Amino acid sequence: LPDFTTGYFTDMRFLSLFGGNAPAVAVLAACLPVAALAQATNSSSGLAVHLSVANRFLNGTTDGHVTVMFAPEGTDPLEDTDVTSSPNLFFGMNVFGVAPAGTITMASTSIINTVTGVWGFPVVSLDDVPAGNYSVQAFFTKYEKVNRSDGSSISVHFPCGDGAPNVDGFGSLTTAILNVSITGDPQTVNLVFNNITATEAFTGKEIGGCSQGNYEDTETMKYVKIRSEALSKFWGRSMYVGANIVLPSGYDANDTTTRYPVIYSQGHWPADSGPFRYPTANFSEAWDNGTIPGENGQPDRPTPKMILVALRHETPFYDDSYAANTANLGPWGDAINDELIPYIEKNFNTIPEPYARIQLGGSTGGWESIANVIFRPDLFGACFSSYPDSLDFHRHQDIPLYTNTNAYLRPNGSAIPSIRDFENGTQVVLATVAQENHWELTFGTSSRSSLQWDVWNSVFGVQGLNGYPLEPWNKITGEIYPAAVEYWRHMDLTDYIVTNWNNSYNLGEILRGRLYVYVGSWDDYFLNEGVQEFQTRTDAAGGPGWANVTILPEKPHGGNYQDREIWDYLELVYNWIQDHGPNGTTPLPSNVTVSSSRGNNFTEVLAYGGHQAALKRQAPPSITGGDHCDGAGGCVFQGSVGRWDPGVELEAQWVVGGKPVGEAFGVAQGEALSYAPTTATKRSSIQLWVTGRKLGYVDETRKSNGIMLKR
């Protein structure tokens, strides 16, 4: 990938703004509003992509997102689409109302508009595709408009058993791969959408068709799926949640007196696999026969007898819901914990007690596992969370989110890294935060790329006025919106714990000794930084070791908890359950599993971050003053621009007698304005009109109250 300061930001449209100074571009472009970026000039090659839809591939007018990939000639564009390694050039564009047998033209312009125009990575403009030979292919992700129960309306892609990939998901329209020579002169590449990515041929008998997959039971693994009433109500359509259940050796469904603890293994889309990649992983044979082979002269020993559960909860925003109640994704926490788990406990021989329900997982699953114990200590006994996503937004990966002004740049102008490796002990940055976010934009706008940074916007943030996630920064420039970041605090798990330490939730005592967290100091995604913040702040509140935190030197992202071998890990968890059961050495007290400690209530989540909350955040402009005007000067009107979503750019206009006075002028959110009439006016009304603009939002002009000028 190109370096942040010498790669795609050296696009001539950016360099022209700053006399070709690439480092200055990197710093200053990150601070510029979109309108300023739009002033850059295009090169003149004039490359366009013309896409047509073959007959019978669309049933009606369709909205969606088109991604076109230019791969090296002879290479399948889908072979490598990863931001750290792909040789491809990616270009994306939203499309609206595409008719059956319709056409789409992708061409870059001098205006950068990710909502209606083309956005590319690692070069922004189609005009900057270097001359050469390419294999080109296009993909059309179709959106459906949905009206949610909180009054919001959005257009998204609903996955169907494919884990919500960022491109070429089930039902996508695709073109054939076309080998093209790009000349550098004006040129049009013609592609035809004449194929559909087929849904997997599922053979199971679960309800809901392909939603959340549909798999056949085996002797040792059972598949369940339910229609969630809570999710279906929120989304206004049938929504499902499923589980892959691995049974222990000797399990007998008819023996209801022998009951088993349950491990809820959180993570990404599992498809038909169980936890720990069962049944293909090496431990599977021993799990099935119930015996762990002895090593180095040690005797064989029995496998720990537990039920292992992997969850299937793909969403319109990602391959996984983060297993929590959120304003953007809906009540997935309730769907899993209040609907699916009771169904599992009704149909399998489980021990339905908190001490016997354990959460574990890594990365995304690491965050989910600890969040579920923090939010539901009444339901689960403990978590074993490995390299979890950001536990504390003082370090969101490597971004000081609460204090920095830009998500892409440090105060000294250097790029903030996102993905790294180590070679001979030296850190090697594989992608910056800017690069990864700009790459995501080619797959979807308004946090719809189905990729990592976008889903964090969906899970941690609230709804914007447009119904989509209120993004914490400008996706193009990286400018952080502090007001938007403040809405993330309710999902900052460290902040949630210390804020509710000794109030009615009493989390300081409720959670003591129940959170086990592991990360390596060389984590690929800098997740060790959030874990360190979590440890520092909880130790400050509860004393050293309040939570069981392990940070192993020089360990990267991945592996089992504390880098343990699989059986060592499973026996550790099993022993915790035995120790904390009613006959164990340290039974889990009933006063730490009380319902009053339950958090992440969906009604409160919507009240805080749903559509009605977004509406309440808004306010029109207002004016005061002018009580003693004579109409010929000598009085001053005070104006407020009103309240708008973070990131909305404002332009104000004073209006007298229904006619603009002077030129419109840019204003900042929260700015106080004043106006002194300079001409005599007979009984004219004075108003303040403010127009707000933000990518992904409808341009809107709001008008203040009117005050009469009197002579």
State where each predicted segment sits:
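A short, amphipathic beta-strand motif
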Residues: 47-55
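Fungal secretory targeting signals
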Residues: 1-2, 7, 11-40
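Surface-exposed coil/turn segments at beta-strand junctions on protein surfaces, enriched
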Residues: 42, 129-131, 184, 236, ...
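Ser/Thr/Pro/Gly-rich low-complexity disordered regions
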Residues: 606-711
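Low-complexity, serine/threonine/proline/glycine-rich extracellular segments that form mucin-like
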Residues: 59-73
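Short proline/glycine-enriched turn/loop motifs at strand-loop junctions of beta-rich domains
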Residues: 62-63, 219, 239-240, 644-649
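Short beta-strand elements bearing conserved aromatic residues within extracellular beta-rich modules
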Residues: 66, 243, 650-653
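Non-catalytic cap/lid and distal C-terminal segments of serine-dependent acyl enzymes
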Residues: 72-75, 79-609
